[in-house]
Amino acid sequence: MKTITRAKYLDRIIELNGTPDIKIITGIRRSGKSKLMQAYIEYLKENFENINIIFIDFMDLSFEEIKEYHALHAYVEAHYQEGKTNYLFVDEVQMCPKFELAINSLYSKGKYDIYITGSNAFLLSADLATLFTGRYIEIHVFPFSFQEYCQYYDDSRDTDQLFEEYTVRGGLSGSYAYRTEKDRTNYIREVYETIVTRDLVQKYSLPDTLVLQRLSEFLTDNISNLTSPNKVSQLLTASQTVTNHVTVGKYIKYLCNAFVFYDIKRFDIRGKKYLESSEKFYLCDAGIRYAILGSRNMDYGRVYENMVCIELLRRGYDVYVGKLYQKEIDFVVQKGSEKVYIQVSDNISSPETFQRECAPLLQIRDAYPKMIIARTRHPKYSYEGIEIHDIAEWLMQE
């Protein structure tokens, strides 16, 4: 299968080379965590001398005998080489029960530069501070961006054609090996179902999967809608899936912990405060939505909004839903001193739609940049200080 260099992630790990932290690569199942680790190992071999690489892949039967934390610890210590820079890489670390005891002990010795990956459901961002006593840095990996999709399919097709494909195929690159749409969607659906019906059920000892499945399908079908556990529980109960807001709230948290969804909270622009009531949930990848729902309710405005949200997170922004009086700004994004207000739409060719998207932005009185991202199929242009971007071209930017 073809591979590409995911330069953004590789550069980030290279920046952390030699720092006194445990480097933890996280992300949804099949997002490319192991491939990234392998690419970094190749980089080290090509660019450094006098190094010792200790690599353990718990998916490989060769390491079956050290799937016990004492044995893992002893194996690493036995392979340490004095006088060299010792790198420790452990892939699928969760397959060794109590792995954190071995990793913490090895970290405390100060002899190893440590990198680990694990299943999304068993190496959760929320758990890291509890698992590891030392400093750690999380490198979060998303499915392929549109830019990476174009890099993978480096051929004569134009950006518009590739964008239409990416809207339904998404960024789970393992699906690209299959020639038919049926096989591709089956692959994506199996990744999704493994997380929802196996990983999370096992992680949290859930009594059954029905409520979790229905909840996940509901959120998938309602991306970009303001949602609360109370509202969702009422709708699920009305559709014969009896539950309550407490269970729904917990299950939403589990789905977000596993990076299936990302929760985006609201921000009152005028009052400059964060709002606790209602939030939006965005799916980690557009391909999952198509694999689960097909063309049913294929609302491109919502799909594009989801794609923009994930891309903003991928680019390192803090993302919020903006509230201004009774109007909504799709995204208020911040990174350091940078702030941008963003509206997302499908088609803004009609004057009515264009004015509707512009109106909330024009009411904002500060001087931060404002933009509309839509399927314009035109180069970037401006209106009343608002930048108008074609979504395919915007996604191709750095």
Predicted segment positions?
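Conserved lysine of the Walker
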Residues: 33
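Short glycine-rich substrate-engagement loop in P-loop NTPases that contacts/grips substrate
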Residues: 54-84
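Hydrophobic positions on the alpha1 helix immediately C-terminal to the Walker A/P-loop
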Residues: 36, 40
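Accessory nucleic acid-recognition modules appended to NTPase machines
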Residues: 181-339
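Interdomain motor-coupling "hinge/lid" segment immediately C-terminal to the ATP-binding subdomain
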Residues: 119-121, 126-226, 259-262
